[in-house]
Every structure is written in C-alpha cells, then in structure tokens.
Amino acid sequence: MVVVSPPSPDAVAPTGSDARWIPDLLGPSYRRLELPLGTDPDGEGPISATLVRHEDSPDQPVAALLVVHGLSDYFFHTHLAEFLADRGIATYGVDLRKCGRSRRDGLTPHFITDLERYDEELDQALDVITADHPGLPVLVAAHSTGGLVVPLWLARRRDRGALDPVVGLVLNSPWFQLDLPDRARRLVDPVIRALGSARPYYRLPLKTSDRYVVSTHIDHDGDFHFDTELKPPGGVGVRAGWLAAVRRAQKRLQAGVDLPLPVLLLRSTASSVGTHRGDGVLDVDTDLILDVRSMERFADRVSHQVTDIPVDGARHDVFLSRADVLEVVFRHLGDWLDQTLAPHTKES
C-alpha cells in the first residue's frame, strides 16, 4: 500500500543554502519560498504565492517538473516527488495566491476574478526553477482547475516567444467544461456573468459533498496524509466572480490553444458526478468531481500531440488513487516522461 506519511519535524537549513527558502510543513525533504505578488487586484490587500522544492532531488537531474493544484487544494504529493526523483527529475509545487500555504487572514480562499492573473506567480515559479537548473527541460503537471489555468498560461508564453524551457505538459483530470447539459449551460452562463460582475464575492448555494476528500485521506478511507485546513473536505465554496472567470477561460481553451508540446492526459475511465450506485453509495474509484467525457472531448484543443490515458479505478486526482491503480498511473507517466524527455537528454 502506498501511504503518504505525516510530515516530519522541520529540518535545519543546509549550510550555504539560500535563506529565503525556509522549512516546509512537509518536513525536512522540502523547503518553501514566498513569491511576493504585491497588492491584490481584487482588493483584498497584500498577496503572495508559495513555491515548494523537493530537496532530495538528484544532484544532476535530467529535468524539473512543476506541480499546479486545483480548487480547494495545495501541493502535498510527496509520493509523486519521490517517484520523479527516482527518475532523475527535480520536483517543485506551487500554491497559488490565496491557496494552501498562501492563504492569509482577510483573504477569500482561492478567490480570483481573472485566471490570467495566475501568470504572475507561474512566471515567477518558472524563473526560480530555471535559475536553480539552467538549461534543464521543464515539465508542468496541472490538476483540475490548474489544468485549465496552465494551458492558457503556456499559450500566452508561446505567443510572446517564451515557451522555453517547458517541453511537456501533464494534465491530471483537467476542468475543461461546466458539466451541465448543453441547454442548461446556455441558460446558466448569462446568470453567472451577471452575478460575477455585480456580486463577485457571492457564494453560490451549490450542493457539496465531502466524500471525495474523505475517500483519499489516511484518517478515513484513503492512503494519503494532507492538511484538511488547506484541503477542506467540504471545499472552500464557489464564488460568482471566480466561476465567471472559469467560464471565460474554458471558452478560450475550447476555441483552441494548440500548444506545440506533447501532452499527457491522465484521467479516470468513468465519472460519478451526482450519481450513486443502487445502494446509494458513491463509487469513489471514479472521478467524483468532473465528467471525464469533457476532458476527452476538449483535449485536442490543448495540443495535437495528446496521449490520452484513461485509467480504470482512478480518482479525480489520479495521484490519490488506490495503490494498485497508482501503480498503473505511474507506469504510464514514466513511459511518457521517457519518451518526452529523450530528445532533450544530453548524452553522457
């Protein structure tokens, strides 16, 4: 069984290390760096993002990978970092503004009215990674809402001739569509736009369930340790201004971004969004959050080099699946990494 253990006590900073990197909640193998972002354009005061670095990465890595989370989430995937380290890859994770480690008193968790603003911390994170590893190829792995944010960010970098050193993208159950029937979506979109403009902080009265988070946490039905203050079982709520921003971004992505990059799409074979088995129990070994059919439908709008891997038994965050399923996920990820990095690996 794969288990992500509770964090160990903080380590002492290595001799000669950059003092800006401080001990992280994940323990001595991880350190974090604050990425200052100035004053919040949405009017909530000073904001920052947080970059986390795996300190046990190889001395001479072949690549670096940046992990970007989704809504009501943060970076805690130590098992992924260890898998990547074994393959010679240095891992970083970013907690975006108002998310995870970047939450502060007086800030509305995960709230933003334009997803393009995340470009600032993503650009900063990439600058830090390239300074740590000059000339090294970089990959990005993005989950759920992060899987919507990142392709659009990379498209804007491409448009200004700054896509390098990014050489590949992993999409982990990306959120490409508002999963409603077409007619309902057409009716709801004007309401979302109006509310997002008039009352951006309005918390929509949407039904939520804690089943997905409970199914993954080690104290309940899962194998993974994470902070339920930073990843709350019931979520952080959906604000009108945030959802309006998501819908604008989804429509831009659906129009096509056509990244000149290989893309790996990891997702479940099935969803149980709003559905139950006959005994009234949710099938937790499916995607409980999003409809995987939307991921399949819009993947080719991201790139024409998409490897779509539906994994039986995978959960919404495929890296939080059962141990036997995770083994399959890692096998596919490893194969894709080998293929993607081969043209960029220097001969010894």
Whereabouts are the PLM-identified features?
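Alpha/beta-hydrolase active-site loop
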Residues: 111-132
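Serine-hydrolase catalytic core
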Residues: 203-310
